[in-house]
Amino acid sequence: MKTPEHNKTTMELKESDFQKISRLVHEQCGINLHDGKKELVKARLSKRLREGNFASFSDYYRHVTTDEGQDELVMMIDSLSTNLTYFFREFGHFKTLRSVLPEMAAARNGDRKGARLQIWSAACSSGEEPYSLAITLREVLGNKPVPVSILATDISTRVLDTAIRGIYPRERMKDVSDQILKTYFRYGSGKWTGFYQVKKEIRDMVRFLRFNLMDLPPADFASDVIFCRNVMIYFDKPTQEMLVNRLYRILNKDGYCFVGHSESLTGLAHPFNYVEPSVYRK
């Protein structure tokens, strides 16, 4: 174990330790930490080493691969996950969703009357995406009698805590219209001045859950719409292909799958039908 003096220095991340950590992260959550990510790993994990009183990255790796270190393994994945997002990110996707929701709602009131409209935000980060989905549903469907369920999952417990609270600083709201802000958010006062909280009626539409995309989704994840955006860019091709085919299996017939604009299913073996760039249908 390290001595207090180590808090004042930056520990060396040896290539052998970086490779071990990279393999572990890939096995656990599919993230591909190539050689260009070495400094990022060093920077983000150094704090964990200092707080955990570890003398080296080797000691830290040994700990997170033991039964006693499983909680710290979760914290390590949290630290290495990239969670940058904002409300209505890639707005074209929400425009497409608005155009197909009436058809989906009609199906619930026709042949599938009473069936629940299920949407899965598969890498929800700090909650902006699923809340954007909930607002879109409310805007398009209003109070129509269509049961709706939004499942929001992420591997990071840290961002899920933020998502559940639904409180965001003013700068995260810069692309949200005044009408949306007034209708679906509460502006803070006192110590919360400069913050907005998603109103309870919208928060109640979303169920948050920690889930690793490398695991098999349970049957109750079956969805009509899946948003799995800006996460596959961190995976290698075999992992991307595995994930895309899992998403296909969990998607209901005629359902839609949205991926990030910087992502593509080109070159991957999959059964999806192409709709438009970054939008696919089963």
Residues covered by each model-derived region:
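Conserved AdoMet
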Residues: 2-120, 260
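Residue-level signal for inorganic ion chemistry
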Residues: 97, 226, 251
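A structural alpha-helix within SAM-dependent methyltransferase catalytic domains
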Residues: 98, 134-138, 248
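Conserved class I S-adenosyl-L-methionine
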Residues: 114-127, 132, 149-151
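Extended basic-aromatic, gly/pro-enriched interface segments that bind polyanionic ligands
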Residues: 143-227, 231-242, 264-266
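Core SAM-dependent methyltransferase catalytic element
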Residues: 225, 266-282
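A short glycine-rich, Lys/Arg-flanked "PGG" loop and its adjoining helix->strand segment in the class I
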Residues: 241-253
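Conserved beta-strand signature within the Rossmann-like core of class I S-adenosyl-L-methionine
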Residues: 254-261
